[in-house]
Amino acid sequence: MLRRSPTLLRVSPFSLYMKDLAKNGTLQNDRNPAKTASRLYRKLSEPEKMALQKRAARVSYPALDAYNRFQKEYAHRFLHLSNKKRQREVSKLWAELKKNGTVKVPKAPKAAKSASSKVKTAAKTAKKTTAARK
């Protein structure tokens, strides 16, 4: 069974490679650009593929992220519908609100602080309290 993971939902290295080929003009006037791109992609060396994977991991689509947050926020309103119909209703709502200019997208959650920064702040407050006691 396929599982859903953030890695699978991101941009694929192959799609980035196809974009690069399209920018270079390699795929211009080609009857089957996907076939040509896949043949060239398979010929890439391992370091080149790893570089593409690293680039793909960094790429995100802000508009898609905003829609996903909106969908997460509003999907619970349509729990009485099947999943497919729920997705349609949320997308209709998104389109309608976007057309009116009244889309309220929830903000992205802030990145959690690292454990080391928490330890440092705790140590600083401990120093301050001990210094204040003296």
Swiss-Prot record:
Keywords: DNA-binding, Kinetoplast, Mitochondrion
Comp. bias (Basic residues): 125-134
Localization: Mitochondrion matrix, Kinetoplast
Bias type Low complexity, positions: 106-124
GO molecular function: DNA binding
UniProt induction comment: Expression varies periodically during the cell cycle in the same manner as transcripts of several kinetoplast and nuclear DNA replication genes.
GO cellular component: kinetoplast
Chain intervals for the UniProt region annotation (Disordered): 106-134
SMART domains in the record: HMG
InterPro entries in the record: HMG_box_dom, Kinetoplast-DNA-binding
Residue numbers covered by the propeptide annotation in the UniProt entry: 1-10
Family, similarity comment: Belongs to the KAP family.
Assembly and binders: Associates with the kinetoplast DNA network.
PANTHER family: DNA-ASSOCIATED PROTEIN, PUTATIVE-RELATED, KINETOPLAST DNA-ASSOCIATED PROTEIN
UniProt function note: Histone H1-like DNA-binding protein involved in the organization and segregation of kinetoplast DNA (kDNA). The mitochondrial DNA of kinetoplastid protozoa consists of about 5,000 minicircles and 20 to 30 maxicircles. These circular DNAs are held together by catenation into a highly organized compact disk structure referred to as a kinetoplast DNA (kDNA) network. Binds preferentially to a specific fragment of minicircle DNA and is able to compact kDNA networks through DNA charge neutralization and condensation.
Stated name of the protein: kinetoplast-associated protein 3
